[in-house]
Amino acid sequence: MIKNNTADLISFLEKSVSPYHTTAEAIRLMDESGFTALEQNKPWKLEKGGNYYVKCFGTMLIAFHVGCEYVPGEDFRLAACHVDWPCYYIKPNPEQVSGGCAKLSIEPYGGMIHNTWLDRPLSAAGMITLKSDNVLAPERRLVDFEKPILTIPNLAIHMNRSVNKGVELNPNKDMLPICKSVEQDFNKDGYFVSKLAELAGVAPEQILSYDLCIYNAEKPMLCGFDEDFLTSPRLDNITSAFAVLYGIVNCNRAHGVTAAVLFDNEEVGSGTKQGADSATLGLMLEKIACALGASRSEYIDSLASGFMLSCDVAHAKHPNHAELSDASCNAVMNKGTALKMNYEQRYATEAVGIGMIEGICAKYSIPYQRF
C-alpha cells in the first residue's frame, strides 16, 4: 500500500509543473472519482450524499462531500494546503543576449535557495491568455514545454576561487537562464513569445499575456539502499495537496460537509484572491450552506463547530546539522506526521486542535511527532 501511494505521489509530482497544472490534475482526479463540477459564479443545486468541486480564479480548488444525513448547521471539516512553491517566473519582454547566448529575464517567487537552481535542466509551464471575442474574458490555456529548454550556468571555479567559501547570487545577473546559442544577427525581440505561440499552436499576436514559472525538469525518484527517501522538486507543498485530495476522494462521512481546499500564493503571503488570506473560502462555504437550505445563522453555526487542518511540510532534523533543530520538539524523516505548534501563532494550532489530532492518531495507530 505504501509503495502504491508512493508511485501515485511521484506521478502527481511529475504532473504538477505549475500551480495551474496542479489544479488541473486535481480536477482530473475529481472527475475520475465522480465529483460534479460547479461554477464559481453560477447557482448551485446540491444534494445530500453528493460530491462536488469548484475551481476559483484558476489555481484555487474546493472539493467537498455532503453527508448523506446532513442537517443545516452541522460542522464543516476542512483540510487545506497550498499548491505554489519557490521558483522563478518569466518576465514580459524577457529576451536578453550576452556571450553568444539568448537568455531570459526572471523574477524570484517566494523564499529561494538560488544555488540549487544552477546547472540543472529547466523547463517552463503555466497559463497564457489569448484574444477572444469578449475582451473581458480572454481565452485561458495551460502550456508546458515538457522538455528542458533552459539552464542557469554556474561560474567555473577557475573564475570564482572563493565559491566554496560562500557566494551571494544576484537574481538579476547570476540567475538568468540561457535558452539558445545565437549569432550576431539574431533578432531577440519577440523571440520567446514566438516559441510560446509555436507551443500553443496560435499566432504570436494572439497571445495577450502569460503567467509562466520555471521548473526543475528532473524527475522524482526514490533513493537510499532501501529506497526510503524520496528526492523530488516541489515536495513543498505538492505532497500535502496529494494527501488532502486522496482524503476527500475516500471520504464517506454521513454528517456535515467535508472539504479539501487547495490555495495558491502561500509562498508570498496568501494575500491574493486565490490565497488563504482572502474572503473566497468563506464565501464559497456560505454558498454551500445556502444551496443546502441553511440560514445565515446556521451557516455561522457550521463555522463555529467546524475544524480545519492546515497542511504543509515540516523541516526534518538535518543529519549534518542536528544542532539547528529544537532540542525536544523536532521531526525525523520516516518517523511519522509532524504536528507543528508555535506559541507566537505562526501555525494554525493550539492545545485543543493538537489534542484532537493526537486523539485521531492514537485511535488509528498513526505515528506522529511534535514539531
Say what each PLM segment does.
Residues M1-F371:
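N-terminal hydrophobic/helix-forming segments and targeting peptides
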